[in-house]
Structures are given as structure tokens and as C-alpha cells.
Amino acid sequence: MKALRYGLFIGLLMTGVMMQGKAFAISFGDEGNLEVTGKIQSRISLRTGNTDGFTFPEVAGGNMVQQRNLATIELNHVLSQQTATMPEFKYHVKGRFLYEGVYDYGPEAFRDVREANPDVIDDFKHDEDLWEFYADYLKGPWFFRVGKQNLSWGETDIYQLLDRINPLDNTFGGAFEDLDDRRIPIWMARGMYNFGNIGPISSLTLEGFWNPGHAGQEVAPFAPYGSPYAYPSPPPTVPVRLHEPEDTFQNSRAGVRIQGVIDDNFNVALAHYQTIMDTPSAVVTIDPSVPGMVAQDLTYETVQVTGASMNFYEGHLNTVFRTEVAWFWDEPVFIPEINAPALFGNFVTGEIPKTNVLRYMVGFDKNFWFRLINRKSMINMYFQYFAEYYTNYDERQKLPVNRFPFGEFMDQERYEDKYTLVTSTTYMDGTLTPQVALVYDPEGALMYIPSIEKSFHPWIFKLAYYGITGHDDVSVGILRDRQQVSFQATLVF
């Protein structure tokens, strides 16, 4: 089986090499065309520090923690172009193949994780999937897209506010992965109607989507214990049971958004939708059918979100300003005395407490000249300030993450904020891109990601360092011992 996967990957790689980076298109008559593109990517990541705290397994600095191989192939076919009498109709297909090799030929510690839990790890380390598959219909003010797809309604990067429709895959790199690369496409029907110009509002558009819950829901995967990017925690002492949402209409993802441009500058949107939390909620259950009569149940809960976003260009400052606000109705939280009363001598099954949460972001994007470091290209800067506020805060509220070494739960503050900054520029006619990304938590943690990317068409090479410093019980600092250096090679065709 291992040899088969290696052979498949090498075969795809050689196919891409023979294509020499060129997309190809096949025309069908005068109206349609078919285009096939893709990429093959391999990444190796090495841990730069020793394992600390509850991180398992123990891995010394310099050891490999990731060897991810990814291949995608996309097909886009335009069947008809829009005319006065005919609609535009096209479809899109994308296949994705993923294989993580660290469990097969990585450090012994990760090979031992696989041997201890072969069924779970063997299923986790590879994926062959019809990643995207949808059809588009466009006629006048109407647009419909039906199929497996991504949908993003937010203005934010790095962290999500309104952009929580699709589940995220945090198991193959966690916070070190780009947000766009973590979204998991889901089956949905999506429609838009453009009302045109109404008063001072232009391009007033109503949009809605529905991801049916009675047909089975896609949820954010849960990282197995011992995987490189799982949150640090002591080994489980009771059975852990993961429960996906029931197949009911009530568990559908669905929402509506209205957006438009005011005075030809202010892009404004209002939205409301229901989605499924990416992190399952934990309760301790008293169950006589399991050994010891105690189990930990993890359940994916639904949440409704109401929010707004706006962006506009300020000519005097040559800057784009962005803002977004979201109200999360009855979001699950973790209060040990309620979720896990058995830990306090009260042997009854726990419950999931909920509260409303306000989250917002203010940011700006600016391009400027700094000729001291770059005479030919501008510097790109993207700044964001994030904040969240728990309205019905309980002083007992915690994060479901254990603090080392005694295992008490980490504090969840009523008000928390973070700053993000991304700066980049280009050299060598746009083929060399250095970038620095920062995430700062005022409570005492900093994540910094310097990287450099060079393209030699059809190849793209990237070298990045993922560093974390500060307190190990504060947001990004929880993964403080996961610092790594990564090298990635991508072949596009």
C-alpha cells in the first residue's frame, strides 16, 4: 500500500514535469472550452526546539515533524457564454490527493504513534477526495452555484469572524497554515440576485446559501492524540467519543447576506447565518456501559452568527480600511463545574453552557514606497486588530486546554485582543517575494513567520520559519514548543 502511494505521487510528479508548467485548453465549438490545470507540492518541516510541557510525543529539535505531499488537478469547462437570449453555464471539478509521510519514515516517536493507533493514523495520514465539484448558472441579475464549494463572507485574514461557513482543517499545520488552505469545501446551493442601483447604493445584491443537514455534515477534523499539531494535553484517562451533528434539517448550515456599494466607495454587507463550530464541545459523561463508567464526549454544536462588514478606499492616505463585526448567539463555552462535574465529586453527566460573544476587527491595507530597501516595487502592509467580548461571562470560564505541569485548565478572559501584521514586497520582476507575518497577543505571546518565495516557472520554492515566543498559556503561545522551519516545492501546470 505504501509503495502504491509513492508510485501514485511520483507518477503525478512526472506528469507535471512533462507538462512543463503549461495549462492546456481544448475548445468545443464556438461557445465552450475546457481547461485543465493543477499543482504538485511537497513540504518538509523540521522542529527547531525540544518538546516541552504536555506535548506528545517527545521530539528533539532538528527532527522532521511534517512531510506533506499534495497534488491537485482542476477542470474548468464553459459550456455556453451569456448572450441576450442564452445564459452562461459552466462547471468546475477539482481532485485532491494528500499523503503525510512522517508516520511512515519520520522520527521513531511518530512511527510509534502510528503503531499504537494504526487504524486512526492510517486513515488520518492520507486523503483522496473529490475536493470541489460545482456548476454555475448566470443569466442577467441571477447567479446560482450548486455543488461542493467554498464560501467566504468575511474581510479578515489569519483569524475568522464572519468567515466561518466552511469548516477548517487545523490538523496539518494548524495556525501555521494559510486560512485559504485550511477551508474544507462542503455541498451547498448558493444563489445571488443583483438589484442594480437603488438610490446611493450600487450593485445591491442579495445572496443566500444552504448546506443541507439531513444529508450528513462535513465538520472540522479532530487531530488524533500524538499528531504533530494537536494541542498539548495529558494522555486521556477515559474513553473519548467524538459525535458529529445528527442528520437533521435543524443542523443545516444556511444564511443570507445583502451587500452593496454606497457612494461608489463604501462596500457594505449585512449577514446572518447558522454554521457548525470547528472545535467540538467537551462534557464528561457518566455511562455504565464503558470501563470505569466515565467517558469524555466531544460534540459539534451549531451556532448562529449575525454581523456586518465594510471596506473603503481613502484617497488622501492611499489606504484601504476594513472593518467587521460579528455577534455569536449562544456559543458553547467551557466551565469545568458544568461541563465536567465529575471532576469535582459530583458524579452526574455534564452539560454544555452557552453565551453570546461579540467579536470585531479593524484593519487597513497600504502600499507605499521605501526605496532604501526596494527601488522597483512597493511595500505591501496589512494590519488588523481583533477583539472578542463574552457578554454573560462566568468567572469559572476556562479554555479546555491543560496548563503544565499540574493539568489545571487555562484561563478564559472576558475580553481578549490580538494584533496581526503582514508585510511583503517583490524583487526580480516579481519572482522573489520576502514576507514577514506577525501575530501579537498583549497578554504575552508572539508568533512570527518570516518567509521567502522564489518562482522559476513552473516551479515555486518557499522557505519559512514559524516562531513562537512568550507565555505558554496565552493563545498562540500554547504551541510555543512547535517552532519549525519548512521548505516547500510546488510544481504548477
Where are the regions a protein language model picked out?
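Residues on the lipid-exposed face of transmembrane beta-strands in outer-membrane beta-barrel proteins
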Residues: 71-77, 93, 132-137, 189-193, ...
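Short loop/turn motifs that connect adjacent beta-strands in outer-membrane beta-barrel proteins
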Residues: 24-36, 76-91, 138-141, 145, ...
